[in-house]
Design a protein with these regions (language model features):
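Amphipathic alpha-helical blocks
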Residues: 2-7
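Domain-level cores of phosphate- or acyl-group-handling catalytic modules
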Residues: 8-280
Length: 280
């Protein structure tokens, strides 16, 4: 009996969660136009004219300054007829997004993380040595241009570092590349700042024939949350489980390779006449 039980037990992490009924898929999914990358809600991809349903086409205007504006008109979903005769529509591309605020709240519920994020305030500082991000002028003076107290000196105020990169998830499929956007808390000591459990996964960009030239559509949900975090939001933490407390955050740094940084920040390409991201 023990042998039969052992053979039926799941052997992978995914199947174990499914076996135990643990749902960790807390991503919000949007349909992506395969041509111009505009995002749509899932329930917006199918249109019904009263007689039949059909896949919607993208109505985005990619070039707003063009004299002759043309809508994208790419089809968003594929029509599939199942064996039982029913019709289903499946999106060609989907974008998975995870709430930054929810991820921050999850991190702050970890024991000791709040205390770790405040350690930088009591560290020894050598004025002649730049040892970490805390020694730079941006970190020291950020937010005090109006004579206020520096933003990061306020309690539960966090500086975020954002990154975007592409990788090949399959070993023998070289032309398939998926992008991810993630963030880390720069308030944390460098020894634990980039640990896997402390990295915030923001979004998963689907594979395209060519990497998108612009990430604006994929960044829109993150920008909305970053604006909310700048004004402060209320969350529960490990030190305050029963009542909510205010937290603030701002993106201070973008850390990517040169091609990804151009797409993330809107800089000119590295082959441009004046392609320096510091000067221009």
């Amino acid at each position: 009996m023990c042998f039969v039980l052992a053979t039926n037990l799941p052997t992978m992490l995914y199947s174990s969660r499914k076996f135990l009924g643990i749902d960790r898929d807390n991503f919000h999914q949007d349909v992506v136009c395969p041509k111009c990358t505009k995002l749509y809600q899932i329930d917006e991809t199918v249109v019904n004219n009263g007689r039949q349903s059909f896949a919607r086409t993208c109505d985005n205007l990619p070039f707003l300054r063009a004299k002759r504006q043309k809508t994208c008109r790419a089809q968003l979903a594929q029509k599939i007829i199942l064996k039982n005769g029913s019709v289903k529509f499946y999106a060609y591309k989907t974008y998975c997004y995870k709430s930054i605020i929810d991820s921050l709240e999850t991190l702050l519920k970890c024991p000791g993380l709040e205390e770790q994020s405040e350690k930088w305030k009591s560290r020894k500082i050598d004025n002649d040595l730049y040892a970490d991000v805390y020694d730079g002028q941006i970190w020291k003076q950020f937010g005090n241009w109006k004579g206020n107290k520096p933003f990061l000196d306020l309690p539960r105020s966090f500086g975020l570092m954002m990154n975007v990169d592409w990788f090949k998830p399959f070993k023998h499929w070289n032309d398939f590349s998926v992008g991810i956007t993630n963030m880390v808390l720069m308030n944390l000591p460098r020894s634990i700042r980039f640990r896997k459990e402390n990295v915030i996964l923001v979004g998963i960009i689907p594979a395209f024939k060519h990497e998108p030239k612009s990430l604006n559509h994929f960044l829109n949900p993150a920008v909305d949350e970053i604006n909310a975090l700048w004004k402060a939001v209320k969350v529960n933490t490990h030190n305050s489980p029963s009542s909510t407390v205010k937290i603030q955050a701002a993106v201070l740094c973008f850390a990517s390779d040169i091609p990804a940084a151009r797409k993330l920040c809107g800089f000119l390409g590295h082959s441009a006449t004046r392609g320096c991201s510091h000067c221009y």
